[in-house]
Amino acid sequence: MALSRCLRTRTAFLSPLDQLNSSFYIRWSLVLHAKDRDKAVNRLSKGLNAVTSKLPFLKGRINYHTDTANNKIASASRAVISMSDDSPNLSLRELRPAKELPSLARIKQQGAPSHLFTDDLYSLPIFIDTTSKQSHPVLKTTYAPIEGGLILNICVHHGVMDGQGLATLTDLWASFTRQQDQNENEVQQPKNLPDPDEPLTRTARLATAINATADPEITDIETSLQRYRNDRILEQNIAASTGDSRKKTSRIFAFSSNKLKDAKEVLANNGCHVTTNSILNAAVWSNLTRVRLSRRTQLPPTPFARFTQMVDGRRQLLPKINKPGPYMGNVVLTSSADVSLDTLVATGFFNYLSVSLMAPVAQAIYDASRKVTTEYIDGFLKTLQKVDDPASLGIGSMSQHGVDFISTSVANAPFYECDFGPSLSEDSAGGKEGKPVFVRYPYIDWADGNMILLPRRRQPTENDETIEAYIMLAEDDLVALAEDPGFCSWLKE
């Protein structure tokens, strides 16, 4: 008699930190070599099947559950992940954009400009209709063939993982893909696999990690909300701009790591202890503000601009947060710094050779990020759990005056270290590593005042490493910024 297999469907609300990011997808592209494209796609498909078998939640779906109480529909709509033992395998399918892509050789020559990574390269939109009764996939993957290679495009639900989680997923996919080119005695299983049920236990894991490192802090809800008013707020206190109809665009700029290191040393010698990240943010923000204001006929009716930065809280919760296995969910909080427009404009007049004069802006950015401590995360998590509608909490929207700036960084996410094996290498016959040629974010033509620090390609210490920043602005401001001598003094020559 045949034995029947008991199939399970498991569901869970995503963690409170996940809920804040549950209305959109993260979309990334990896440009890879592929001398034999059919073979490369076959290897990638088998690798995808392997990693999704190990982590079945990647084959799961997201629904949005609206609580009802006393026969009334509450405003809260929370994301729920469901995963089943009989979920179908994911497929890696071909998806070509409307405009023909250049060859890999040409992409290398151009430096993989942002405008190549258009919206129709991806199988899912950025934004999700959370009022829809439909379920939404956790993960979808496609590839676009190009002469000499392919572009691997990944769409993952942001409520299920953040940028560091996607880096973990990509590394696992690369590892299982690489195995397809190895002999049985050469195959090594990944040593640090995430828990297969990881999304089901996140809220408990966060609490455990926080309790292991944080001092207890008890506050009422109003005190908590007041504390986080500059980062996450109940109401969007500043209405988003509706009057700016200027065309928006985006572009990648290559900054010099050596110049930033030199600047850090100069500032340290002057008693300003900051990071490379805060220096780069200060250089961009101050120059951008100067360029923005210089092109206006009327100054904005506010003396300050706000800098908002995404801060990865994982480092505060290590090592407990990564037990058992890497934590793939969201641990991203925000820090904000308000600096006067006069200070920003004055700082923006200083070029790379006058770095000591930018200390106030760099220090303000650094000090804001240092506020994200374990206790800060603990208090914020408890605040989220007390709020009826976590979706109403969000990053304070940028002012209507077009002077604010938002920055996020995945510079330390090791995408360029992901080795997909010789089938995805420049010399497949030579058994070389199949690491990405470029890692790119989609082209954005609707944001004004945003920056993403792209993953870094680590170089030997004697080389001047390139740090790529993807800047999104009104088109006329971006053109002026790209031609500005002060801003360009920070770029790699």
Swiss-Prot record:
Main function: The biosynthesis of trichothecenes begins with the cyclization of farnesyl diphosphate to trichodiene and is catalyzed by the trichodiene synthase TRI5. Trichodiene undergoes a series of oxygenations catalyzed by the cytochrome P450 monooxygenase TRI4.
Top-level enzyme category: transferase
Source organism of this protein record: Fusarium sporotrichioides
Protein name (database record): Trichothecene 8-O-acetyltransferase
EC number of the protein: 2.3.1.-
Keyword Plastid: no
Coiled coil: none
Gene Ontology terms for molecular function: acyltransferase activity, transferring groups other than amino-acyl groups
Induction comment from the UniProt entry of this chain: Expression is positively regulated by the TRI6 and TRI10 core trichothecenes biosynthesis gene cluster transcription factor.
Something else known: Trichothecenes are sesquiterpenoid toxins that act by inhibiting protein biosynthesis.
Bias kind Polar residues: ranges: 180-191
Region (Disordered): 180-199
Keywords: Acyltransferase, Transferase
One Pfam family hit: Transferase
Keyword Acyltransferase in annotation: yes
UniProt pathway: Sesquiterpene biosynthesis; trichothecene biosynthesis
